[in-house]
A protein has these predicted regions:
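A short glycine-rich, hydrophobically flanked beta-strand micro-motif that places a catalytic Asp/Glu
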Residues: 44-49, 178, 182, 252-264
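Active-site nucleotide/adenylate-binding loops and adjacent lid/helix of ATP-dependent enzymes
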Residues: 1-14, 99-187
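ATP-binding N-terminal substructure of ATP-dependent carboxylate-amine bond-forming enzymes
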Residues: 1-95, 99-101, 105, 112, ...
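Short beta-strand-to-turn element immediately C-terminal to the catalytic PLP-Schiff-base lysine
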Residues: 123, 151-157, 193-195, 262, ...
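Phosphate-binding site of ATP-dependent enzymes
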Residues: 159-240, 267-271
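Hydrophobic beta-strand scaffold residues
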Residues: 43, 88-89, 117, 138, ...
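ATP-dependent carboxylate activation and anion-phosphoryl transfer catalytic cores
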Residues: 5-8, 114, 231-316
Length: 316
């Protein structure tokens, strides 16, 4: 039990205007419902809008549960605002959020610490119409989006022309800066970290295509195997990498690290893809699922995240 005062004024900040707005609304509703069910008497749901600072100034919360996903709630913007206002908030601070949302910056921090990540290059979307940035197959993803928004797998002789033609309707067309990475064969896995401790490994098995936005948030489109059926050494390695990434980036509260594992290469085939500092808290989300596997109910998970936000030295 967290021992939190049930009279704390908790504002659950959700919604916003990113491509992940719908997910944020689901996460926020789940958090607010759980707090109310656990006896918290002052829970306010706040839909993120451009007057958010004025609203928070009126509400004067003791703590904000940041249930936003994508910009501006996951890139350090909202975190910086809350720091300036002197309001405690959940999850990672301003600098960590700004680094982790940018996949190129994340690599710059983690790779020197020995964390294996795919080698890639940043390209602008217009250059794709001149030719492929690297040999196929490769993955294209926006530099600073989450939830697999805008991700495309470009295959040899496959889905988007050769070179990508101006007529190709690829998801990259909505973004200026893209990260191109070699496609890594194998299995999709993820590790949640809570309070600095890795919980377990989940394998994600989409029933069609890859683990994109729809597969993540549509019930029945992806099988979650939790805990993943992988050798203990592989699970330990992934959990160690996730905990290290959480620490080196300076994450707080909960984070989630996504991996690809080429199982033909053993431990040498483990690649960290990205670290999510604002992981989903919906009914289908992976952090609550792994918490349940560890015997932590959803409501307790929410309280633990808030308790860390209110701990001495945790602000921002």
């Amino acid at each position: 039990m967290s021992g939190l005062d049930k009279n704390l004024h908790i504002v659950v900040l959700m919604g916003g205007w990113s491509a992940e707005r719908s997910v944020s609304l689901m996460s926020g509703a789940g958090v607010a419902d759980a707090l109310t069910e656990r006896g918290f008497t002052r829970v306010t749901r706040l839909n993120m809008a451009h007057d958010v600072a004025a609203k928070l100034g009126e509400l004067k919360p003791d703590v904000v549960f940041n249930a936003l996903h994508g910009t501006p709630g996951e890139d350090g913007t909202v975190q910086g605002m809350l720091d300036l206002m002197g309001i405690a908030y959940t999850h990672s601070g301003c600098a960590t959020s700004a680094i982790a949302i940018d996949k190129e910056l994340t690599k710059a921090v983690l790779v020197p610490h020995g964390i294996r990540m795919p080698k890639g290059k940043v390209v602008d979307s217009a250059s794709l119409y001149e030719g492929d940035p690297m040999p196929r197959p490769y993955v294209l993803k926006p530099v600073n989006e989450g939830s697999s928004v805008g991700v495309a797998i470009v295959t040899e002789g496959g889905n988007h022309g050769h070179p990508i033609s101006a007529r190709a309707e690829g998801p990259w067309k909505h973004f200026d800066r893209l990260l191109a990475e070699p496609f890594i064969r194998g299995r999709e896995l993820t590790v949640a970290v809570l309070g600095g401790e890795a919980m377990c490994v989940t394998e994600l098995k989409p029933k069609a295509g890859f683990y994109d936005f729809d597969a993540k948030y549509t019930d029945g489109l992806t099988e979650h195997v939790c805990p993943a059926e992988v050798p203990p050494a592989i699970a330990d390695s992934m959990m160690g990498m996730a905990a290290a990434a959480h620490r080196f980036l300076g994450c707080k509260g909960a984070s989630r690290s996504d991996f690809r594992w080429d199982d033909e290469l053993g431990e040498a085939g483990i690649y960290l893809l990205e670290v999510n500092t604002q992981p989903g808290m919906t009914a289908l989300s992976l952090v609550p699922e792994q918490a349940r596997q560890k015997g932590i109910a959803y409501g307790e998970l929410v309280e633990r995240i808030i308790a860390e936000a209110l701990s001495p030295g945790q602000a921002g």
